[in-house]
UniProtKB/Swiss-Prot annotation:
The chain crosses the membrane at residues 33-53, 77-98, 113-133, 178-198, 226-246, 288-308, 320-340, 347-367. GO terms for cellular component: mitochondrial inner membrane; respiratory chain complex III. Keywords: Electron transport, Heme, Iron, Membrane, Metal-binding, Mitochondrion, Mitochondrion inner membrane, Respiratory chain, Transmembrane, Transmembrane helix, Transport, Ubiquinone. Component of the ubiquinol-cytochrome c reductase complex (complex III or cytochrome b-c1 complex) that is part of the mitochondrial respiratory chain. The b-c1 complex mediates electron transfer from ubiquinol to cytochrome c. Contributes to the generation of a proton gradient across the mitochondrial membrane that is then used for ATP synthesis. Heme b b566 binds at H97, H196. It is a multi-pass membrane protein. The keyword Metal-binding applies. This is Cytochrome b. GO terms for biological process: mitochondrial electron transport, ubiquinol to cytochrome c. Its main location: mitochondrion. It comes from Balaenoptera bonaerensis (Antarctic minke whale).
Amino acid sequence: MTNIRKTHPLMKIINDAFVDLPTPSNISSWWNFGSLLGLCLIVQILTGLFLAMHYTPDTTTAFSSVTHICRDVNYGWIIRYLHANGASMFFICLYAHMGRGLYYGTHAFRETWNIGVILLFTVMATAFVGYVLPWGQMSFWGATVITNLLSAIPYIGTTLVEWIWGGFSVDKATLTRFFAFHFILPFIILALAIVHLIFLRETGSNNPTGIPSDMDKIPFHPYYTIKDILGALLLILTLLTLTLFAPDLLGDPDNYTPANPLSTPAHIKPEWYFLFAYAILRSIPNKLGGVLALLLSILILAFIPMLHTSKQRSMMFRPFSQFLFWVLVADLLTLTWIGGQPVEHPYMIVGQLASILYFLLILVLMPVASLIENKLMKW
């Protein structure tokens, strides 16, 4: 008798994607982050669903409803903090997943990579609108500052901002629509993630060497299911440790003050995972220039497959490219630190230099290093 997982129309799809999937035998733990992102998404959707049952998207009651969730709802506090810190874990996994893709040349799978870039934009949009919902000071002012950036668009900017706000300032209409967006976007992310996987199944997984591994494949289950379970346990352990011991470590204390349009916080800054882009935005004195740099800092990822000049796919055997990759990582950490600092003398110039280096590395230095490595291969 044939196994049901191989014959049933629905089970067959799941079987081909997660059980009998031929997988390279040498993929490292850096390949765990895809499944961890799936786990993060499930955690976020479930905790978010329970939070939405008690949350009220109204300017007069939003802040109080979050307080009510934490104080009066059974285990509301843990659901709320799992959701808030789950977002941080999501972005840690996302950046590690992208870094892996960049290092090992996974961007050669054009369709998979491009869907990934779209996914990144969608996740960032979801996190942004979600941060507005508690209606604290940083929620309100973050929403005001970031949406206001669109006013830099010539001719239609001001109209566009007022259209997004649903009025002449961030108010009840803005909060209601942001809640609607925050509820629907995770399901769009889920659909895009499935498309991402469909495109990946077309080509099969890459591996650390970047060399085709068709002659050396092993089934996904049990070898990589057990490996993914270990990664999942470590993720859950980290998330629970963060949630139970330091729930506010990555948040902003200003968000415990109810939103007040008449009082501006001393330092307006987004959550830590957006600080690198915020630093790039602030490092350009011109408003439109800053907005374009902000957009390009993420959109540049879509051009990476075109900027790949090396004859080798992976960076495993390319020392110059490896060095520049880690310089890029250090540069992004520097930008993240600068984004959280006030706009004054030493930080401004460091932020500007780090922003220049970011674009220089991706657009010039890394492609040139790859060309030099191509020449050295002939020696």
